[in-house]
Each structure stands twice: as C-alpha cells, then as structure tokens.
Amino acid sequence: MTDQKLAKAKVIFVLGGPGSGKGTQCEKLVQKFHFNHLSSGDLLRAEVQSGSPKGKELKAMMERGELVPLEVVLALLKEAMIKLVDKNCHFLIDGYPRELDQGIKFEKEVCPCLCVINFDVSEEVMRKRLLKRAETSNRVDDNEETIVKRFRTFNELTKPVIEHYKQQNKVITIDASGTVDAIFDKVNHELQKFGVK
C-alpha cells in the first residue's frame, strides 16, 4: 500500500559495488540538485548507533556481512521519505535495491523509480579504495574478509537488479574508475535524458 504523500516522489536508485564511489557522487549530486539523499546503509547504521534492540540485531548481521531483511530497510526508507517529501520530492536512494525483490517491493509499496545510476568499476579498484577507507572509517564492514563477502553479495544479488531495470531502459551505467569530477560530468550528462536538469 503506497502512501499518498509519496505519490509525487521522484526516485533515483544509485547502485554499484562496495567502494565504487556511490557516496561521493551522491554528495556532489545533492550539492548541485538539492536532492534528498537517503543511504540505506546510513539509515541502518543510525539504527545500530541508537542502541535499540533492533539496532543490536542489525549490528550482528552487518558484522557477518549478511543482508538485512527487506521489510526493515523498506520501512526505514519509507519513514525517512515521508518526513522529507513535502520539502523536496526528488530522492537519491543509495545502495538500494540490493536484490530484485527489494526493487519490486519498493515500486509497489512506495513509488516507481525514475532511473537507476549504476557505478561500474573493477573489483581490484574497489578493494583498494575500501582498504584505504578502512584506515579512517571505523566501519564494521570495511575489513578484508567482509569485503570479499560484500563483493559476492553484490555479484549474486545486485547484478540481476541492474538487468531488470535495463530491460525497462532505466539504467545509466557509468564507468567509475576515473576522477571524481570526470565521473560526475558523465552522470550529469546522462541524467538530462531523464529530465533532471
């Protein structure tokens, strides 16, 4: 059941393997277009930090490199969107959907997505970026063992999501191995085709 308030929401899903630079590009898009930026990972980490019973359960799952149940993530996203939609109806949703069911359920229960930005980069580059980030991030999922699991999860579960939206001609695939600015220029150019200016 969709919420009436969310009928006008325009959603862009942002996908890419761990360390593909999604977060950095989302920050730049927010600066330029003033989108609402929701990261499923940030919402989950905030829940973990709150120390709630649900947060403790989520922390254990994230440390094991497992995917958090669909309903939990969807509820957190929907709640955040309802709070923000009156100010701005454009949303960048980062790191979601991780698997096909999540995308289908989101579109059924929240709203259809406008397009999907897919940041494509080799595992070697992503691994180097993640290990460099691990030196300063204090994130429970930035360690060698969990990184390998996160790549496997991405390959097995998220790639079918990208294929699904490709069939609807909604995917913007961006080579994310260049500089931050070069990547951003490409994203900007492609978004214009979906009426984002």
From Swiss-Prot:
The GO terms describing molecular function are:
adenylate kinase activity; AMP binding; ATP binding
Q: Does the keyword Cell membrane apply?
A: no
> Keyword Transferase on this protein?
yes
Main site of residence?
A: cytoplasm
**Which CDD domains does the entry link to?**
ADK
Residue numbers binding AMP: S40, R45, G95, Y96, P97, R98, Q102, R139, R150
Name what cofactor the protein needs. Answer: Mg(2+)
Keywords assigned by UniProt?
Answer: ATP-binding, Cytoplasm, Kinase, Nucleotide biosynthesis, Nucleotide-binding, Purine salvage, Transferase
Q: Which reaction does it catalyse?
A: AMP + ATP = 2 ADP
Q: What is known of its domains?
A: Consists of three domains, a large central CORE domain and two small peripheral domains, NMPbind and LID, which undergo movements during catalysis. The LID domain closes over the site of phosphoryl transfer upon ATP binding. Assembling and dissambling the active center during each catalytic cycle provides an effective means to prevent ATP hydrolysis.
Biological role: Catalyzes the reversible transfer of the terminal phosphate group between ATP and AMP. Plays an important role in cellular energy homeostasis and in adenine nucleotide metabolism.
Sorted alphabetically, which HAMAP family does this protein's record hold? Adenylate_kinase_Adk
PANTHER family (alphabetical): NUCLEOTIDE KINASE (PTHR23359)
The entry sums up its family as follows: Belongs to the adenylate kinase family. AK1 subfamily.
What is the protein's given name?
Adenylate kinase 1
Tell me the organism: Schistosoma mansoni (Blood fluke)
* Classification lineage: Eukaryota, Metazoa, Spiralia, Lophotrochozoa, Platyhelminthes
